[in-house]
Amino acid sequence: MTALKNDRFLRALLKQPVDVTPIWMMRQAGRYLPEYRATRAKAGDFVSLMKNPELACEVTIQPLDRYPQLDAAILFSDILTIPDAMGQGLYFETGEGPRFKKAVGSLADIEALPVPDPEKDLGYVMDAVRTIRRELNGRVPLIGFSGSPWTLATYMVEGGSSKDFRKSKAMLYDNPQAMHALLDKLAQSVTAYLNGQILAGAQAVQIFDSWGGALSAAAYQEFSLAYMKKIVDGLIREHDGRRVPVILFTKGGGLWLESMADSGAEALGLDWTCDIGSARARVGSKVALQGNMDPAVLYAKPAAIRAEVARILAAYGAGSGHVFNLGHGITPEVDPAHAGAFFEAVHELSAAYHR
């Protein structure tokens, strides 16, 4: 594989010295970019775009072409590829978000689910990873990702998005045996899927636990974090002569950073409700931190964006171990020029913290 020209992102995850704080952005390939909207229109719809390796590669690289400051590319895909490959039948309703043709309701449903083979059942994702790595040609590292078992389980049990997770939580409390069976199968599937991405060329991986923060403290430990730890334990940690860092991101997980720091992951993603300085004090030197600007700051003028970047950099303080990001994905209505101002501010203002 081609040597990396910019490994700042990987170095920061391993708390090695960097010249400036690296930056990437969740959903950096997304609807706020006119070029993304044009490619999506060419594909016809989101699922067709995601399942076409050439077009998925095109949209992955678009933000890097527009913003030379970006220090990583993230695979263009969706967290729901695994349930789709298990036969749930993913589709998107306009204005409704993701739906499944089949929901999971019983232990029998769960026992019937296959563990997808990454190359056979999710080959379009592996092909996209290979295509993107080839096209990047060492420009920046490529991040692979998956949803967490708990987050995937909520979609599978609810049959799509949910505001209150009533079916998933009812199963968790009424029938913990069934929920554990589902989470165990999903943990096996996510481990195989992320290892497939690593073998295909992903140089770091992130586990998105979007709905872990909806759980009680006790339920989070038992039904979310325990399964993410299981995944981390089963991942390929060295590939292509380099460490493959793992980032755990639980939205709403700020209360549980200490136990997340014991997961074996190299880094924790933070949402914007955490103070990054106190998060750093709490986790010590165990893990790097990623985040954590409120995505809504990007609606403000560039001077306000710059001020918030300065505040977060000062809160983290000097030294490596910080990857700048938003606290969640960028929203579609943001002006692309504001994203550019954000990236420029991070590199420019962070240099002083790395001397």
Curated annotation (Swiss-Prot):
Binding-site residues for substrate, renumbered to this chain: R27, Q28, A29, G30, R31, D78, Y155, S210, H328
Enzyme kind, highest EC tier: lyase
Kinase keyword on record: no
EC number of the protein: 4.1.1.37
Name of one Pfam family that matches: URO-D
Compartment list: Cytoplasm
Annotated site location: Transition state stabilizer: D78
Record text on subunit structure and interactions: Homodimer.
Physiological role: Catalyzes the decarboxylation of four acetate groups of uroporphyrinogen-III to yield coproporphyrinogen-III.
Similarity annotation: Belongs to the uroporphyrinogen decarboxylase family.
PANTHER family: METHYLTETRAHYDROFOLATE:HOMOCYSTEINE METHYLTRANSFERASE RELATED, UROPORPHYRINOGEN DECARBOXYLASE
Protein name as annotated: Uroporphyrinogen decarboxylase
